[in-house]
């Protein structure tokens, strides 16, 4: 769960969160939004809300992360079923769920930009700090460009990007 200066949402804050979501959805209804636009609103609103409020459970996953992973799995499974001509989603997921879990329905895509440390730290001492920040920013932008290209080529949304940082990224897609 992200660490921030502001505390986790308390019971008194939930009405405020619902109001913020309602205000966003009055401007543009969710069914008219692009997936990435809806994802951004949910990230802004739910990143500091725990996914579980059950007593005795550790609140270590945000509601946003829970929703995002659920969307990645659901969209990947839907695409898999559509591409394999499976029309009875309930039968595939529920009735024959245990049997179908053994199938390779999901594909995890991983990338590692090796050698980035050499690139970042190969600087002269004069102005080194500015160069380090500049090179780090450049690599982050290159990585984001590559991620966006892959997502676009595979017709995936940002929900399918599970993690990116430190020269690595992981995505989920249909197999």
Feature locations, PLM:
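Regulatory and interdomain segments flanking nucleotide-handling catalytic cores
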Residues: 1-175
